[in-house]
């Protein structure tokens, strides 16, 4: 249900998504629950790339999946906060309050996601063309032939070579980098306002990773979409992000422009993440490779609470 004009006016016109004090809990053993996301707030402007960065277990992927309302299928519950999104028609809604049926209709059309491993997302028994076309026919009133043409055009958009032939191929016939391009094509098929990329380059070698990052930047300029980029790699953050939110143990500990985060990191954990990135020339004049001079940061224990 669209929000009232008063509520909509709280969202600046250039903002696509605003997450406010988001709280997510997972049921644990006995009567305990684990607060995986604790008071997270951030916003994403139109055409902007926001990087949500942190180590494994920091809550960054849970935050992204919660925006898509997918964590509820894994036993999680949203215990507080709002997820306000501006749709392509200008209406604003709180995704937390929408029905599952309504949210399902928004996935792919208004907001889409690209996962880390394309082989776990692509169906091995359907062709690439069929899988992209399915997303189109699900959200748009298109004939099978029209959907196939849109699938072809989208493959060309993401720079898949020989796109006509790839339409009739299966996922196992493509390389890892090509499969990830197909996943991005599926996410873009209905031209969503926001694309969530959940560590899309982690399983790829550095050369293909660079190609995917270049592709995302180029697509943003061509389409004008916003991006929420989930990663643990500060090197990737430096390449892709406009703004950065550093996440630790379910909380955002530092936020700033990508320049400010790298030029003057304020939190010890941010400095530790940056120090983990190898620096070209750091081993110059050394007789043998040395260990990276990591900054040690001891986080607080995970919050486990008794269920109410």
Language model segments and positions:
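A short, proline-enriched helix->beta-strand linker immediately N-terminal to the Walker B motif
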Residues: 189-193
